[in-house]
Amino acid sequence: MSIPSILRKETLKKKDKNIDLQENNINDLVVSASRVIAPLWPISTFAAHHPWMGLEKQSFEQVANWLKEARNVDIYPSASMIHSAKAKGEIEESFLQIALSRWLDSQSFHMPRETAERFCQEALKLERLPSSLLSSPELNKLAEEINYVNTGSMKDSSMQPISSLIENQNGDNLSDILNYHIIKWCKLYLDDAGASWAMPNREKGFYRAWQHLITFDPSLSKTERKVLKDWPEDALIALTKALSELGISESNMQAYLEGHLLSLPGWAGMIRWRSQQSIEEQELLIEYLAVRLSMELAIVKPYLPLKNQKVEKKVSIVPLIASWIYWGDISIEKWLQMSAAEQSELLAFAYRFDENTRKKLWLEAWEQTHAEQLREKIASKQRATHDKKRVVAQLAFCIDVRSEPFRRHLEKLGPFETFGIAGFFGLPIATTELGSNDSHPSLPVILKPKHQIKELTDENECKSYEQRKMVGSSVRYTFKTMKQNVLTSMLLPEVSGPLLGLQMVTRSFVPRRVGGFIRNLRKNMLQKPDTTFSLNHVHDTNCEIPIGFTKEEKVNYVRQALKMVGLTEGFAPLVVMCGHSSQSTNNPYAAALECGACGGAAGGFNARVFATLCNLPEVREALSAEGIKIPDDTIFAAAEHKTTVDELEWIYVPELSETAQEAFDCIEAIMPNVSQHANRERLMQLPHFKTKIKNPSKEAHRFAEDWSEIRPEWGLARNASFIIGQRELTRDCDLEGRAFLHNYDWKQDESGDILANIIAGPGTVAQWINLQYYASTVAPHYYGSGNKTTQTVTAGLGVMQGNASDLLPGLPWQSVMQSDRETYHSPLRLLIVIQAPTKYIERLLNNNFTFREKVQNKWVRLASVDPEGRWKNW
């Protein structure tokens, strides 16, 4: 099967290759080709993303087949994962049979249905064909005799870089040599870690900086340097020239560029992300491709022109015949007795029912089993009757799956009501903490901040605090400078050895006590003063975005968030906005455990800002005029849910009313018990704990402080569903920490705008998280990041395996695997469940083309629960 570029522009017309391309044509081709890679955020602000976000106009199946053909990357679960899931009861056989029947109904074939079904049933066992059968002389002789049969499939190498088709005299593939050079130059240019010797001319851009140095690179041969000596100074011209001299026709250029981007998707993804951050680097992806293809030309030029550069071959029919012999019980003798038409029919059918198709049916059965189990769980709780108990406090948590067990235990142990909302609380802000000049976009990465909020305090207090911070910063700076200096680096071990040695021993043997001691020591030394926020609107010419909010904006953001979760009446005396954060030591992936809705940062800042806005008299008066009446004795507070230790840390508690104080005391009284239950449930899922845990909270703190711990928590592993509805829908349901939960009351959303906003914002973030975990599980060698213990943090950007690998884009092995042989994360596409009438879902799909496309192309699954409790799969 000839596989063209899946994003090839339909309007691209073939031209004579001697005609020069216009610059905008190359620009357009690079933009189109870039969709095969996803932007990669730096690991310090690790943002969940899924690697196929630019390919959603194609179906999941099309992309899976294309990746298998183009890169030999399999994005369906492996046979071992499927067998393990079936053994654990996660896949119902009946759903597999339904999926198979549906597939057979969609096919056209001229053989008895029973024959086709028998073949498929055996093939679905996912057993490998015996190597003895595939190498059998009789089978290969038969294949030669009937090789006239055309399955309609051709191999097309136009996607592959020319360097991948050539080996040098040492047997090294030239693409590996090219990748080695590109990795080296990317590390030099992108280094944000403050290397002592920065890349010269870096300010002129990647291509120009590379060009100034490349002719002095001793790792290149004299011939290779000569090719690049008089190379064009403009990146776009250089890229065009390289494509021309490599002999790439215009009709194949986009596919060729895609092949190069997919060769190092991590580094290319980081380049793409950087190109989106500033006007100065907006051409960075073109520069990257110019460097890469220029170097490829220099390396492969002695081998050009290639003979049979583009080779088309028929797919071998040996495995197709073998599959009918092994699974269809058709012997070689029977094959010889068939007519050519009968042989062709069998081979074409076996080709269509290939490994990807078989795994696709298994995945659909797995997902349908999960959906049915979730439906039954929700339905059983709906049938149960609940006594309406008095609520003394309401707590709003992030939709993060780690909040679900904590919320469940909290509601079970006390008179509380919980809500789910995106952890940035609808505030499109960039935050600046006290004593810092840097701001952090504290919102989902798909959005841009509109306001800057600064943490403020008394001027004298601020200066004193900054001085204390500077002491610690100076020590770190001095240590780093000595470490990077040629002379002082030899003295540093003598000076710091005793102290660091003591730290190593104590951190290793008593991590919880030492970690707590260091944390408290740092806190006592800094003595951070009480702070407020710059909430009032100020236009600062030094800031790209305004500081603070206008009165209308304050009211609008509070109203929007309260309506989004359906909290417009029945306010409890105490309403707590709970952001969340994680706590771990020596963990490059710390940001991956923070709040995804806050751009890989803790959510406490947003929670505190929102709670402060809710307590402002001017905001309450305006809301009251609109019908949202917050009682005078209702107080909003803010806290932070520490997901690694399942504790609630108060970060903003204003003066409380009498009833609010009672609610606060009630929360404080039961919180140790909630933490014990939540920690026990969570720790029992970790590989080390299969027996009873005496003190779960103590163990959780040890995990958080132990710098040798490679798995302080599971993060968002096993996430599988996103439930949008009232809390009554899932109250008392043990969702096993697998569901994102967002409150939604369709009765307060006549226009459907609230639902549309949930789908566009939190829904997209949840989908990205889900598919990142999915990709890191099914294809860890390509989309994951390998073993944590052998990773190298490089250039302040991300991790590599060793010092010359791709920049690894996904999650580490420890985030998704239970052991070397068994996965922990179940690779299922996200199931979005919406509690609303059918007409609401129909309107959503009709009005939101992007979401409809995701559902139709099976990037997400969709179900709904109507007001009568009826479940519908869409």
From Swiss-Prot:
InterPro entries: DabA. It comes from the Bacteria. It is a peripheral membrane protein. Pfam families: DabA (PF10070). Disulfide bonds: none annotated. Keywords: Cell membrane, Membrane, Metal-binding, Transport, Zinc. GO terms for cellular component: plasma membrane. The keyword Acetylation does not apply. Its cofactor is Zn(2+). It is found in: Cell membrane. The keyword Cell membrane applies. GO terms for molecular function: zinc ion binding. Zn(2+) binds at C398, D400, H580, C595. PANTHER family: INORGANIC CARBON TRANSPORTER SUBUNIT DABA-RELATED, UPF0753 PROTEIN AQ_863. Belongs to the inorganic carbon transporter (TC 9.A.2) DabA family. Forms a complex with DabB. Part of an energy-coupled inorganic carbon pump. HAMAP family: DabA. This is Probable inorganic carbon transporter subunit DabA.
